[in-house]
From Swiss-Prot:
The lineage of its organism: Eukaryota, Fungi, Dikarya, Ascomycota, Pezizomycotina. PANTHER family: ATPASE SYNTHESIS PROTEIN 25, MITOCHONDRIAL. It is found in: Mitochondrion inner membrane. InterPro entries: Atp25, NT_sf. This is ATPase synthesis protein 25, mitochondrial. Residues 66-76 have a biased composition (Polar residues). The keyword Membrane applies. The keyword Membrane applies. Residues 47-76, 283-313 are annotated as: Disordered.
Length: 704
């Protein structure tokens, strides 16, 4: 050892410096010899008398390297294992999985809160928001929608997230969301437990379990939050609607939740982004088409004097390029304002056209349709809407005569000639919609030459080509399909027979209307369904209904009434009054009185027409007990209505008719001097009918 290490501090110091350190630092060596750093002086040091002895420390010589290094090392040294390394801040890379997508323009107020909840609380990754509000054709999930797409980590996380989202929307925003593909909490646990049990049994038996479709690993849940904002969307520059229906007020929010594998398989983002891009290109092509040079006039140009009125006729533009099978026409249904220099020429041309196209002889102007065409001197062609409106006001016999032999007949009557002449001047989509209206009118009037199958095909043609069909026209189609067959088609006993096939067609039309955003859960639709349920489906079904009890007889209509009560449909006074009459005529008196009492509660006070309907229905029923109760209860209530209903007019005749049904000998009782309530009402009605005025007996009954 003595041979290896030299004596003294130099040998040990050299050995320690030669050994490498694990931490990359050299060990600090302190000498074993205590070397004093005090400086020796040959002379005694002069000290101040004021300062105490030893109060001033000794200052080392700056040239003394040993003293300087020792003091700095002892005061600043910290062991390496206690030293804190400085944190090097590196720029954090934030992936798309950890980001909340940007909000679309004019988004509802709930959207940022919903995205934050989905991202932070539910823990869905790779969120993506797609704005579908600008699509011309609304998606199947509903018009005016915003779609949110997220990825769950597992099937269990997927179901739990969807369940929590539905509960949060119900409790926080009072919405009614529904989730397609969601399993309940207990149902998911039970299915997972059964799946694990089958896997254990299969592993013991040495077989495998086929898990292609176990009802759990669908990997896709669609949570539709419904309309989250009732305010209508911004008005567009053009009010013309193409595709399914009109603009729907309010914004819908739909959350699509996937597992990672299912999201890559479905590629929902690619589908809708391609649809949005295609829609954008179509709009751009339409804008470019409208911005092209004006079309060349086919006829000789006629100078037009500008009118001083505020009605401005805009220029009609035509594309310079002709697409395959493209046909565009500019239509005018109003009389153009012409200048003085062209008025005479235009009148001559109009007279020539009337002489060529319309027969204005006295023999030809014999029907109301001819008179309508003769009165329209501003247009060479009669508008189809005006023709159909005029046709709807005619009696049934005249309507059947004007419609000719059937839908193949186009020139047997003046109405058909003018209607199809007007169709030839219209665009393809307008002509298709006009044919649908004509079929609805013909079927509703029981014309045998127009079938419901042809109406269904015409509706599907408009649906296929995305022609605009208004909600009113859609309900007219449903009403026409639910029109009962006339008696002479099934024999005299088969009054009001509605086959099952016609009901199925009407329900399919309602399904198509609901898919394009039409609200089909309203009083009007349920009144149509109630009327349809009151008709038998066949001749044999009608005979069975007559032999069963009243409870069985009203069973189809009672189901519709229960649906109206359970769905809490918005109350519509006009449709409610129609439904009341249908309920009374079908024997559903409880439903009738329920709606009767609801009228003033929903801000629709009862009127004189309502009381006329009430007493007329009871008189037609010819039930003595119900007639007496109706008169004794509701005649005094007429003066308590707001505003009061006067006892005059047709309601007096209906009350007297109802009194004769309830008390056939009431006139003899009145002459005998009876003072019963019914006799007092009879006397008042009789005096008013004879022009003597009201004596106030009913008012005295109210006081009593």
């Amino acid at each position: 050892m003595n041979r290896v290490l030299s004596k003294g501090p130099k040998g040990l110091n050299g050995l320690l410096r030669a050994c490498p350190s694990n931490s990359g630092r050299s060990f600090l060596y302190h000498s074993t010899y205590n070397v004093s750093s005090r400086t020796f002086w040959s002379a005694s040091r002069l000290r101040s008398e004021d300062s105490p002895s030893g109060s001033q420390p000794l200052k080392p010589d700056p040239n003394d390297g040993i003293g300087n290094n020792t003091s700095s090392a002892s005061s600043q040294h910290t062991p390496w294992y206690l030293q804190e390394e400085a944190l090097i801040e590196e720029p954090r890379q934030i992936s798309s999985r950890d980001q909340i997508p940007e909000l679309p323009e004019n988004s509802p107020a709930i959207l940022p809160v919903l995205l934050d909840y989905i991202f932070k609380d539910l823990g869905l990754d790779e969120l993506r928001s797609i704005d579908l509000r600008g699509l011309e054709t609304p998606p199947p999930i509903g018009a005016n929608s915003i779609m949110i797409i997220g990825t769950a980590r597992s099937v269990k996380h997927l179901n739990v997230s969807a369940d929590r989202l539905c509960r949060w929307l119900r409790s926080t925003y009072k919405l009614t969301p529904y989730a397609d593909g969601l399993l309940g909490r207990n149902e998911l646990k039970i299915k997972l437990r059964r799946k694990a049990r089958r896997a254990r049994v299969a592993s013991r038996a040495g077989t495998t379990v086929d898990e292609k479709d176990d009802g759990i690993t669908t990997g896709w849940i669609c949570v539709n939050a419904g309309v989250v904002e009732n305010s209508p969307v911004g008005e567009q520059a053009s009010r013309k609607v193409e595709g399914f229906g009109n603009i729907v007020g309010g914004t819908r929010v739909v959350v699509q939740m996937f597992t990672e594998e299912k999201r890559a398989e479905v590629d929902l983002e690619g589908l809708w982004l391609a649809t949005i891009e295609r829609d954008r290109r179509q709009k751009q092509v339409s804008i470019d088409t409208k911005s092209d040079a004006p079309h060349e006039e086919v006829r000789a140009p006629t100078p037009v004097q500008n009118s001083s009125s505020d009605h401005v006729f805009g220029p009609h533009c035509r594309s310079s390029t002709i697409l395959p099978l493209e046909q565009r026409r500019g239509l005018h249904s109003k009389c153009r304002l012409l200048g003085p220099e062209t008025e005479h020429n235009q009148e001559d041309g109009l007279d020539d056209g009337l002489d060529d196209g319309l027969d204005m002889s006295p023999d030809s102007i014999s029907t109301p349709t001819d008179q309508l065409a003769a009165n329209r001197t501003c247009d060479k062609e009669v508008d189809t809407d005006s023709l159909l409106e005029h046709l709807s006001g005619l009696p049934d016999e005249q309507v059947l005569s004007e419609l000719g032999a059937g839908q193949e007949d186009r020139d047997s009557t003046p109405f058909l000639r003018r209607f199809y002449d007007a169709l030839s001047q219209m665009s393809t989509e307008e002509a298709a919609v006009a044919r649908v209206k004509l079929l609805c009118t013909a079927i509703s009037r029981h014309h045998q030459g127009y079938s419901k199958e042809s109406l269904w095909k015409a509706f599907m043609t408009c649906n296929y080509h995305t022609y605009p069909i208004s909600d009113e026209l859609g309900f007219e189609i449903v009403s026409a399909l639910l029109t009962a067959l006339p008696p002479h088609q099934k024999g005299p006993k088969a009054t009001g027979v509605l086959p099952e096939a016609d009901r199925e067609l009407a329900l399919r039309v309602l399904e198509h209307l609901s898919l394009r955003g039409t609200d089909v859960l309203n009083m009007k639709v349920f009144h149509l369904l109630y009327e349809a349920a009151s008709h038998p489906t066949s001749f044999s079904g009608e005979e069975v209904i007559k032999d069963v009890t009243d409870a069985t007889k009203d069973r189809p209509t009672s189901r519709v009434a229960k649906m109206i009560e359970s769905l809490d449909i918005q109350f519509d006074p006009e449709d409610a009054r129609k439904l009341m009459m249908s309920m009374f005529r079908n024997g559903d008196y409880d439903g009738f009185w329920n709606l009767w009492h609801k009228l003033p509660l929903y801000g629709s006070p009862r009127t004189s027409a309502d009381y006329e309907m009430l007493f007329r229905l009871h008189a037609d029923l010819r039930d003595e007990c119900r007639a007496r109760d109706c008169v004794s209860t509701w005649v005094p209530m007429m003066s308590r209505e707001h505003p009061p209903i006067p006892l005059r007019g047709q309601v007096v005749q209906d009350i007297m008719h109802c009194l004769l049904i309830g008390e056939p000998a009431i006139d003899r009782m009145a002459r005998a001097g009876s003072t019963s309530n019914l006799v007092l009402i009879w006397n008042d009605c009789k005096n008013i009918a004879l022009g003597r005025g009201r004596r106030g007996s009913v008012e005295r009954m109210n006081v009593v």
